[in-house]
Amino acid sequence: MNDYINGLLHKIDDKYLYIELNNSGYRFLYLKTDLKDLKLNQNNQVYVAINVIDNVFKYYGFKNQLIRDLFELLININTIGEKTAFLILENYNYNELIDIFKNGRTDKILQLKGIGNYTARLIINSVQKELFNNKISDKKNKVITSLEKLGYKTKDIYKIIINIDEDMNIEDLTKYVLEQLSYLHN
């Protein structure tokens, strides 16, 4: 697979970039936020991602390698497709996304139309595990869900639970997180 191509951008429509390289034409889905950095009728370097769904190859072109890498990470999460990945990447820049993922800011992901609580948590957990080696165990997920039902903010719970040792049982873990949450709100 190619990491990137550098070719003549000869057409852009609502969905695709059309790039010619060595007398071959390539068509890429693209982020609308990349439009400002693309130059029509000039050579453009585009970072490539490929997704195969039901034996259909889809090619994606990105102006930024880090954004392309985040896209690949997102579409490899179960139930997250290109539309959800594009929605996230078009609404936040790279640094904002890293902050959102690092700090477990599900509230920011939930602001996007069509993304519910389960999906937002799945995205945050998966990206944290991949980028920051933060794995949320089933035990911690049960505590998070319980405290959310009691009305606590997911982002506050995450800030605390990420750094807690796995050795505690669910009751002790819940008590500890509740205690820490009380300090946050005082």
Swiss-Prot record:
SMART domains: HhH1. Has three domains with a flexible linker between the domains II and III and assumes an 'L' shape. Domain III is highly mobile and contacts RuvB. One of its GO terms (biological process) is DNA repair. NCBIfam families: ruvA. Belongs to the RuvA family. The RuvA-RuvB-RuvC complex processes Holliday junction (HJ) DNA during genetic recombination and DNA repair, while the RuvA-RuvB complex plays an important role in the rescue of blocked DNA replication forks via replication fork reversal (RFR). RuvA specifically binds to HJ cruciform DNA, conferring on it an open structure. The RuvB hexamer acts as an ATP-dependent pump, pulling dsDNA into and through the RuvAB complex. HJ branch migration allows RuvC to scan DNA until it finds its consensus sequence, where it cleaves and resolves the cruciform DNA. Signal peptide: none annotated. This is Holliday junction branch migration complex subunit RuvA. Disulfide bonds: none annotated. It is found in: Cytoplasm. Homotetramer. Forms an RuvA(8)-RuvB(12)-Holliday junction (HJ) complex. HJ DNA is sandwiched between 2 RuvA tetramers; dsDNA enters through RuvA and exits via RuvB. An RuvB hexamer assembles on each DNA strand where it exits the tetramer. Each RuvB hexamer is contacted by two RuvA subunits (via domain III) on 2 adjacent RuvB subunits; this complex drives branch migration. In the full resolvosome a probable DNA-RuvA(4)-RuvB(12)-RuvC(2) complex forms which resolves the HJ.
